[in-house]
C-alpha cells in the first residue's frame, strides 16, 4: 500500500470522526445494550438468544446504513467541494484515490463494529452473568458482518463513481436487500422455467450473497460454524469486494471530471 493511499484513508477516517459518526455509534451501543437487556429480561429462559439475535442484527443493519450513506458521498462530496481537483493535481492517481477512500471507510466501519460489539457483549454479560464457550461464536458472526460491510463499501463506491448520491443509495440498498435473500432467489429459480428461470438464476449469482454471511440465527442458537464456512465466506467476500472496487476504479479512471 502506497503512502498516498494511507494518507487518503487516514483523511477519510478523520472526516468520519469529524462528522461525529463514531460518537453517534457509541451512543447507539449504549442504547442497544439497554434495549437488549430490557427485552432479554422479559424473555424468560431465552435471554441470551434474544440479546444475541437483537444485538447482532442491529450491528449489521446500522453498519450497512453507515456504509451506504457515507460511501455514496465519498466521491460526490469531493467533487462538490472541488477538493478532488486539488488532490488529483498532486501526484495522486485516480485508482489510489478510490482505494484510499475504500480503506478509510472500511477502517471506520471496523472501529464502529468494535464499539457496537462492546455493547452486545455488555448486554450479554448483564443477562447471563458470565460468558460461556459458545459465546466465542459471536466473534465469528461479527467477522462476517465486517466482511458484509466491505462488500457494501465497495458497491457504494462503484455506484458513486458514475451516478448521483440518490441513485447510488437506491442501487446499493436494493442490492443489499436482494443479496440478503440470494439463497431464496436460487431456490425460486429452480422452481421456474424459461426466461424467468434464466433471469432469476443470473440475478442470484450476480448479486452479493449476503445470506451466506448471515449466521446470526445460528450463533444465537449456539450452532457450530465450521472452518470451511469461514474460509469460503472470507474468500468470497474478498473476491466480490475486489471485483466491485476494480469496477469503481475502471469507471472513475474514464470519468470526465470537468
Residue ranges with predicted function:
Residues 15, 76, 87-89, 156, ...:
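Helix-capping/transition residues at the boundaries of transmembrane alpha-helices
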Residues 9, 74-106, 252:
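Helix-loop-helix units of permease transmembrane domains in multi-pass membrane transporters
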Residues 24, 28, 99-100, 171-174:
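Hydrophobic core positions of alpha-helical segments in small-molecule transporters
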Residues 254-258:
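Short cytosolic juxtamembrane segments of multi-pass membrane proteins
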Residues 30-74, 98-167, 183, 188, ...:
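Secretory targeting signals
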Residues 2, 35, 43-45, 167, ...:
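Terminal transmembrane helical anchor/hairpin motif
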Amino acid at each position: 500500500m502506497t503512502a498516498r493511499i494511507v494518507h487518503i484513508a487516514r483523511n477519510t477516517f478523520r472526516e468520519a470522526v469529524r462528522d461525529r459518526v463514531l460518537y453517534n455509534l457509541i451512543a447507539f451501543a449504549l442504547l442497544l445494550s439497554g434495549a437488549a437487556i430490557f427485552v432479554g429480561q422479559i424473555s424468560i429462559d431465552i435471554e441470551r438468544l434474544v440479546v444475541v439475535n437483537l444485538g447482532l442484527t442491529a450491528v449489521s443493519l446500522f453498519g450497512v446504513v453507515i456504509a451506504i450513506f457515507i460511501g455514496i458521498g465519498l466521491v460526490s462530496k469531493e467533487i462538490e467541494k472541488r477538493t478532488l481537483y486539488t488532490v488529483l493535481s498532486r501526484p495522486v492517481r485516480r485508482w489510489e484515490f478510490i482505494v484510499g477512500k475504500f480503506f478509510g471507510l472500511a477502517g471506520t466501519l471496523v472501529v464502529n463494529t468494535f464499539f457496537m460489539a462492546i455493547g452486545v457483549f455488555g448486554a450479554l454479560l448483564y443477562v447471563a452473568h458470565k460468558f460461556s464457550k459458545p459465546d466465542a461464536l459471536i466473534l465469528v458472526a461479527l467477522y462476517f458482518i465486517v466482511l458484509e460491510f466491505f462488500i457494501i463499501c465497495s458497491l457504494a463506491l462503484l455506484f458513486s463513481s458514475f451516478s448521483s448520491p440518490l441513485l447510488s443509495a437506491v442501487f446499493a440498498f436494493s442490492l443489499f436487500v436482494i443479496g440478503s435473500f440470494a439463497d431464496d432467489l436460487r431456490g425460486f429459480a429452480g422452481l421456474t422455467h424459461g426466461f424467468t428461470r434464466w433471469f432469476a438464476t443470473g440475478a442470484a449469482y450476480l448479486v452479493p450473497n449476503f445470506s451466506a454471511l448471515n449466521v446470526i440465527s445460528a450463533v444465537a442458537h449456539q450452532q457450530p460454524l465450521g472452518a470451511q464456512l469461514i474460509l469460503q465466506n472470507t474468500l468470497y467476500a474478498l473476491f466480490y469486494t475486489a471485483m466491485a472496487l476494480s469496477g469503481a476504479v475502471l469507471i472513475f479512471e474514464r470519468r470526465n471530471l470537468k
